[in-house]
Amino acid sequence: MKISRHAYADTYGPTTGDRVRLADTDLWIKVERDLTTYGDEVKFGGGKVIRDGMGQSQLSRDQVMDLVITNALIVDHWGIIKADVGIKDGRIAAIGKAGNPDTQPNVDINIGAATEVIAGEGKILTAGGIDSHVHFICPQLVEEALTSGVTTLIGGGTGPATGTNATTCTPGSWNIGRMLQAADAFPINMGFLGKGNASLPQSLEEQVRAGVLGLKLHEDWGTTPAAIDNCLSVAERFDVQVTIHTDTLNESGFVEDTIAAFKDRTIHTYHTEGAGGGHAPDIIKACGEANVLPSSTNPTTPFTANTIDEHLDMLMVCHHLDPSIPEDVAFAESRIRRETISAEDALHDMGALSMHGSDSQAMGRVGEVILRTWQSASVMKRDRGTLPEDKGDHDNFRIKRYIAKYTINPAITHGIAHEIGSIEVGKLADLVLWKPAFFGVKPSLVLKGGVIVTAPMGDPNASIPTPQPVHYRPMFGSFGGSRTASCVSFVSQAGLDEGIGEKLGLQKRLVAVKNIRGLRKSDLIHNNALPRIEVDPQNYQVRADGQLLWFEPSKVLPMAQRYFLF
């Protein structure tokens, strides 16, 4: 029996060689492989395959999956493939062909009476996003992040304190303890950064032992060469990451002095970008260093006609500046440069900027990490054309490059890639399911540890799930013991050794970060380019390996108003 490609895609989703458009962007994915078996696909529903004695076996719970996502189109850094995904005990247990081994060939994902099913036909499955630049200013940001497809938050803060409004630091063991206790209340993974601005090690060591997963150096606390050196020295001893927001005013040195203070040690440079802060005007040079793991944040990506206008007021509020003081205004204006903002998009597209975060409520938007990543990718395809690695009628390599920026690369950078960051066997089942037309904008389901935590849902009093008003609502995975069982808090190994879980009465599983020190940019996936960056000190023009990086700001974007009319 033969079936047309169109009819097959309507029934089981796209297969090898089919192309799928991402939302209303100019980006197209092409299915590289199909791990299901033609004629023996599994599908749930009345008159469908997953029934007793057909696609469902007689095997007991220990031999079958707890959950199977059928016929999903996986989009990850390692490939774009069609497959069934099996989940057991909250982890990804298999990627391949699901069904009943007694009646079907090539089955490596067993379905039984103990198995739940999510229909992935015609949908895209991605790993949950990781936002590695979060100001924990208000708890409500968790819901915004989850409903955008982000399942892990890394950053610092204690609420709407003046220090937190500006810096991603949770300072001191007492504050760290309170935030770890608060993390138990949320259906999302969290990890906290301590304050790294000190010239002697004791106060930093205390914070690492209190359970932070890393330390943050921020110019508002004084990012001097001495503080940088001391902080990195502590991090080397404890195998934690250091994130840095460098010295905009160049008071304690220039970008070359800061890079020298790194002493070739691994560091995650926040705001390696156009307007987010750090050495003016040339912090962007840091993305050409082999020991620097660079990221940028979403207020400047993609560069649009409105970007410059909104930035001055945002900056004045976030960094506690006074518009009546000329020096404060000059400080703010020195950070906002059209030329470096435009170059930021291009450096992302080249793979020179490796990660993308939000800078939540501190100039960035926590619910737009994924959205703006794909907007930027589409704009860069329009402005720079198809990448050399993409041959033919698809954008697979560009898509792998951009998805790595908010999944696997922040996971590698912060020592949590053994748990999350990709759709791979053994990792937590932190997964997001999308309709292609809404990809990157509005997820269909968000799973944490194999449990649905949020989804669009209609009127709870309706006779079916779909009647209006349909909006995101917390699901069962967001409540009670399920919440703490399906999520983790990432901490230092030193914190685990100190017994912080018992001391603080924490309910979430604590996972130690590891394998951080000694990382190089070459360890990051699809985003490890090391161009020679030059910034003209007079006109701020940016060149990478001699090529001018300038593109006009966009006036129209994909994934914008048509998706948010209601």
UniProtKB/Swiss-Prot annotation:
Gene: ureC
Cofactor dependence: Ni cation
Listed name of the protein: Urease subunit alpha
Family affiliation: Belongs to the metallo-dependent hydrolases superfamily. Urease alpha subunit family.
Cofactor notes: Binds 2 nickel ions per subunit.
Bridged cysteine pairs (disulfide): none
Entry superkingdom: Bacteria
Catalytic reactions on record: urea + 2 H2O + H(+) = hydrogencarbonate + 2 NH4(+)
GO cellular component: cytoplasm
UniProt cross-references to SUPFAM superfamilies, sorted A to Z: Composite domain of metallo-dependent hydrolases, Metallo-dependent hydrolases
Modified residues (N6-carboxylysine): 216
Top-level EC class as recorded in UniProt: hydrolase
Origin species: Nitrosococcus oceani (strain ATCC 19707 / BCRC 17464 / JCM 30415 / NCIMB 11848 / C-107)
Pathway where it operates: Nitrogen metabolism; urea degradation; CO(2) and NH(3) from urea (urease route): step 1/1
Post-translational modification comment from the UniProt entry: Carboxylation allows a single lysine to coordinate two nickel ions.
Main location group: cytoplasm
Pfam family, one: Urease_alpha
Subunit structure, as described in the record: Heterotrimer of UreA (gamma), UreB (beta) and UreC (alpha) subunits. Three heterotrimers associate to form the active enzyme.
Urease domain: residues covered: 128-566
GO biological process assignments: urea catabolic process
E.C. code: 3.5.1.5
Positions of transmembrane segments: none
Keywords: Cytoplasm, Hydrolase, Metal-binding, Nickel
